[in-house]
A protein has these predicted regions:
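Compositionally biased, intrinsically disordered low-complexity regions enriched in proline and serine
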Residues: 10, 15-18, 69, 81, ...
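Context-gated lysine
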Residues: 5-7, 16, 65, 84-86, ...
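Bacterial Sec-dependent N-terminal signal peptides
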Residues: 1-43
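Short charge-dense sequence patches
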Residues: 18, 42-45, 66-72, 162, ...
């Protein structure tokens, strides 16, 4: 930020950028021109949701992660039937969120791995909505990640990347952030 030192700098700045009245007038003029040049479009509604799925784990052990709680012989007695029920319950809630228009984009937290998302999007009632997904592979010790599922006919994924959270002293690694760029399709 520079400080203006004299009237000459002030007048040069106003010539270069215009004063506030000029900028407002140009902005309004551009808005009016753009409004006339763009044909009227109907309002298109889409829904966005974010959900902590609270330990969406499969029933297999990942030797690189601490997922022992969610195995068939572990303390939670996590088995295939409970896993399938959880997938079904999540699918039911997702479709209910949108009433007749299920969410176009859904951010999911606490997803274990790249196995549970195909089970959720392709082997559950969500398969009819043609959801696709992108997810992180975080250094979290329990193996939980974040993901975005999206309806392919409503959203075009352009790019995605994981953003690591710095680990501070006396803290353990945690889930990465998921940064996604895309286009809403009309």
């Amino acid at each position: 930020m520079s400080l203006l030192k004299n009237k000459r700098q002030i007048s040069l700045r106003q010539l270069k950028y215009g004063n506030s009245e000029t900028r407002v007038a140009v902005t309004i003029l551009l808005f009016v021109i753009c409004s006339w040049s763009v044909p009227a479009q109907e309002n298109i509604q889409f829904r966005v949701a974010c959900w902590n799925t609270e330990n969406l784990f499969d029933t297999r052990h990942d030797s690189l992660k601490n997922d022992y709680e969610f195995l068939p012989n572990a303390i939670r007695h996590w088995n295939y039937n409970r896993y399938k029920k959880k997938l079904s319950d999540i699918a039911r809630v997702i479709t209910a969120i949108g009433e007749w228009n299920p969410p176009a984009l859904i951010g999911l937290c606490e997803v274990e791995n790249d196995t549970v998302l195909p089970d959720l999007t392709r082997r559950s009632p969500l398969q009819e909505l043609d959801y696709r997904y992108v997810m992180t592979d975080s250094p979290d010790l329990r193996g939980i990640d974040v993901a975005l599922i999206y309806q392919r006919d409503l959203f075009k994924l352009l790019s995605s990347r994981s953003i690591s959270i710095p680990v501070f002293r006396q803290h353990r690694p945690t889930r990465d952030l998921l940064h996604v760029n895309g286009l809403l399709l009309t």
